């Protein structure tokens, strides 16, 4: 039976999980907390953990606001119709108004995205989807988390030992 090693660390932000949400949370924590100690703990490896690590062929929500293709209000209408009215329109609007800048950030980080060579616009598969070469999606976002965290623990488990302590 393998012996488990226990690490004790103090931190300001502990991100549990290294999928897309965890790596994104690690990056955002550093953005908003420059002087904080940030640790990310993942049960596998952040380079290839989570559903996105399998690779994607499209980003399923892109407005294209810089080319006046869609606006956040358009996406709210789409979501309201698709979900038969069961939608928080304020949250949908808020998400939609930020999605383009996130996609542009992924593009700057090196995510291979299919573009029209003449116009520079992203190629679409539909009204909302843009085509990407997604096998490198997760490693690119994981790299941003690695640069943002003070420490990454891969192949690690967390146990709640006390109400305010994890081991």
Residue ranges and their predicted role:
Residues 25-28, 49-54, 165:
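Short acidic, glycine/serine/threonine-rich loops at helix termini
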Residues 9-11:
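Core beta-strand elements of the Rossmann-like FAD/NAD(P) dinucleotide-binding domain
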Residues 3-5, 37, 43-157:
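Conserved N-terminal/central alpha/beta ligand/cofactor-binding core
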């Amino acid at each position: 039976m393998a012996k488990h090693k226990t690490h004790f660390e103090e931190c300001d932000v502990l991100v549990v999980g290294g999928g897309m949400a965890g790596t994104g949370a690690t990056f955002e924590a550093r953005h908003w907390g420059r002087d904080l100690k940030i640790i990310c703990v993942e049960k596998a490896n952040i380079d290839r953990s989570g559903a996105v690590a399998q690779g994607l062929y499209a980003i399923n929500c892109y407005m294209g606001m810089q080319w006046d293709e869609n606006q956040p209000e358009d996406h709210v209408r789409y979501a309201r119709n698709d979900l038969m009215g069961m939608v928080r329109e304020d949250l949908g609007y808020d998400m939609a108004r930020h999605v383009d800048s996130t996609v542009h950030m992924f593009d700057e980080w090196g995510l291979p995205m299919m573009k029209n060579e003449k116009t520079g616009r992203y190629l679409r598969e539909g009204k909302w989807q843009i085509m990407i070469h997604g096998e490198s999606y997760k490693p690119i976002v994981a790299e941003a988390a690695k640069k943002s965290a003070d420490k990454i623990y891969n192949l690690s488990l967390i146990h709640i030992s006390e109400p305010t302590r994890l081991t």
